[in-house]
Amino acid sequence: MVLRDEILVRHVDRVPPATGRNNGHRSRPPAGTAPSTMRAAIDALAERRAVALAPADAAADRRHRAQGKLDPRSRLERLLDAGSFTEIGLFAEHRAVGFGMEDSHPAGDGVITGWGTIDGRTVFVFAHDARVRGGALGAVYARKLHQLLDLADSCGAPVIGLNDGGGARIQEGIDALAGFGGLFARNVRASGVVPQLSVILGSCAGGAVYSPALTDFTFMVEGIGNMFITGPDVVREVTGEQVSREELGGARRHADTTGVAAFVAADEQSCFDEVRDLLSYLPSNNQELPPRQWSGDPADRRCEALCDIVPIDDRVPYDMRRVVAEIVDDGEYLEVHESWARNIICALARLDGNVVGIVGNQPAVLAGVLDIDASEKAARFVRMCDSFNIPLVTMVDVPGFLPGVEQEHAAIIRRGAKLLYAYCEATVPRIQIIVRKAFGGAYIVMDSKSIGADLSFAWPSNRTAVMGAEAAANIIFRKQIAAAADPVRRRQELVREYERDLMNPFVAAQRGHVDDIIDPADTRSVLIRSLALLAAKRAAGPVRKHGNIPL
């Protein structure tokens, strides 16, 4: 048996000295004499494949590993089911000339493409190889990605991209730029058709950032993943600002501040585990339902702890995540954008084994108020769920939209409308649960019946109104309070009157805006029965090209 290293040495020995620069990349082996038998042809193929699979640049490989990063093939092995990967495009090579390009033709051209399985389900994958010209994209590299996305679109399977590259290959000029354009167009065409996941495992700079930005979910690994359109050197040259790569576009920055990263992991293996976990909640394409996984958690299980988790006084905060955990199967859920816009929660979970998307105000952060970031975070999540046939459950405890000059000038009118638009357009089953306060326009936006929720239920702690009693009293009873002999006492009386007449738990139900007032302990069983009913829901919108969402 011939060892792979022996094959590699044999081929390297055959290669004549290259002329010009080769940047340390191993040149392709010469074609040689045509094999005389099939067996000889198979042996030649094995030798050629061994060379193609070996690192093209030993020095670049050492530098890559010194950063604590896995090589791209090891990444695919850890992400996919064992032995499931099938590669295409292994022998693809660039055809560029000039700038020393003709002296080096690494097999694969810097990107690995193919398909495999995760939990037995087909996925298409690509992995940038940062050891080949920094992972920069050229024309052939791009063509491999185009083919992969076309196959995923045709076969109806998710696409996972392991990103570790430096943008367009400068030496290939406009051909590289056109390659990115073709990639972006395919990302958009596949949007809402098959799940697209981007994993940032190194640099993702310049035009390269827009492909992950167009996909459904972006994962980043702390310490090695970073994303920016212009790097620290350009920022310093143009603006004079001093900033590190991590501060400018590191994983924590995009998870906490920009919302670009939906998930952040401490290391690559943890990241791959999260990718696999997320896929377990998603269908392979928009014509399928998410996979059902029944855990044995009884559908009629009462959630008695909810009465202790949620205080009756709507001024007292609590953690909505505890409410979600109490209701869903086995208390398990996957939160999306956990550290961005923390005043709203977006999570994937299961009820009676069926996947649901949960949107909930978070009273523990900013009292659960809706602001720009919360609106955009929830809007994107709602649209993702609607794209992939995931029913929506909305847990409401909202005092309104966040007031202030900063929010108004940052366009909360337009950007807050995104959540309203997303809910109104969604055709999946939609159920609203009013936990406590539901005030003003924010109540409407949080999937009220008036904008199309299929069913609305409220707890006896609900207080639904245009605004809270204290604020309302200052407006509608202003003259009466001012004319009173004891304004403080009169104001308190009028506040209680407002609460009695307009904020009692039964007003919304009496007027048909809520379908029932339920015991909080029955929330799980009510949701499961309602979702079973709505599984047969059919909804068709008007004939149109597309709506004009307030982007």
Q: What is the predicted function of each stretch?
A:
Residues V2-L551:
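Ligand-binding clefts of soluble mixed alpha/beta catalytic domains
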